[in-house]
Amino acid sequence: KTAFALHLALAAGRAGKQVLVNSLEMQGERLGDRWLCAQAASLDAGHLKSGQLSADEQQQALEAARQLSCLPVYVDDNPKASMDHIRSSALLQKSKGHCDLLIIDYLQLCDMKSEQKNRNREQEVAEASRKAKLIAKELDIPVILLCQLNRECEMRADKRPALSDLRESGAIEQDADVVMLLYRPALYGLTSERKSKFPSEGLGMVILAKHRNGETGDVYFGHNPTLTKIGEYEPTLEWMARNARSSC
């Protein structure tokens, strides 16, 4: 989910939008490494992590860093941030003209301490979800709030996630205008995706499970974990030829 969100941040930044990323899970340096790989043409994430880069990869990293430095993407990597802190940070950036999009990674890591006692976890998550919604309305910006799923989807044959899998609170579904569930069949050892029959290698899906003002459905994307890249999905020519023969 982090890789997908970071690609959204890059796309918005390239389009000239001011992006604020609140990362409660990863330090800013680690996000920077992922962005370098995403921005470069073919920079191996493993090579970057180990520091063992070829001459070509070094040049790619330098050029990617130069390009990234020009993008209006800002990071707050406070690991103990509450929704109130995130709101204050977003308000400050908005006052400077630096916040057209807010990304929060992720909901369950937010500091949910409150003066209200005897609240259960579901109530805490519901309050945090509601505050994220209020931030979006107050600042009049889209807020992308990442969230963990529970393990129920792993009990299904195809492991496909559903709205009911949103972890710890049904309020998330109620508050959100759009709910996008990420799904990669290959992670579960599946060789193809059930509905499309596409081969699972390199395949990712955005399942639009809720869209308040539009249609729901599935969107396919290509994923290369070695290069930390997300883009258009294209089945191999071999698969297309084989599938065409089987359809005859």
What are these regions (language model features)?
Residues 41, 46, 56, 82-99, ...:
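C-terminal regions of RecA-like/P-loop NTPase motor modules
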Residues 3-4, 8, 31:
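Hydrophobic positions on the alpha1 helix immediately C-terminal to the Walker A/P-loop
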